[in-house]
Amino acid sequence: MTVPSRGETPGPPAQDRLTHIDEAGAARMVDVSGKDVTARTARASGRVLVSPRVVELLRGEGVPKGDALATARIAGIMGAKRTPDLIPLCHPLSVSGVKLDLSVADDAVEILATVKTTDRTGVEMEALTAVSVAALTVIDMVKAVDKGAVITDVRVEEKTGGKSGDWSRS
């Protein structure tokens, strides 16, 4: 812990600080050059609440625009790979794998993304972006039938690897 100079107020402990904000309060990209390259994985999930008619179509003949789940799966994979282009302070990473699982529940399309890398920082944002882009694509694919579809519950479920170790929501 750094001892503050006279007249300065000590800041919060490092684990209580926002890493993307510098001492002056300006946004910055965190320097990860000193971190070890390790295997890292993140899983994120989300749901798109849809009408009973959309559920019926997805389980049967499909929606008018085409294969909604296959299109959303590919969009989610593309989203994970483009995360640093969308999230300003995200590091470009060597994403080594992205898996998207989409399933039709009684009232929603459920989305689960798993992203893997061997790099200096985690892939939580890539997993969240994969879920978000897949969910947006589901909305685009079903909007002709259900203009009231809702994206909800987008969240990280677990992460492994890195200095902070493993974490799981459960």
Swiss-Prot record:
Keywords: Lyase, Molybdenum cofactor biosynthesis. Catalyzes the conversion of (8S)-3',8-cyclo-7,8-dihydroguanosine 5'-triphosphate to cyclic pyranopterin monophosphate (cPMP). It is an enzyme of class 4 (lyase). Pathway: Cofactor biosynthesis; molybdopterin biosynthesis. InterPro entries: MoaC, MoaC_bact/euk, MoaC_sf, MoCo_biosynth_MoaA/MoaC, Mopterin_CF_biosynth-C_dom. Its EC number is 4.6.1.17. Belongs to the MoaC family. It catalyses: (8S)-3',8-cyclo-7,8-dihydroguanosine 5'-triphosphate = cyclic pyranopterin phosphate + diphosphate. The active site is at D140. This is Cyclic pyranopterin monophosphate synthase. Substrate binds at L89, C90, H91, M125, E126. GO terms for molecular function: cyclic pyranopterin monophosphate synthase activity. Homohexamer; trimer of dimers. The keyword Iron-sulfur does not apply. One of its GO terms (biological process) is Mo-molybdopterin cofactor biosynthetic process.
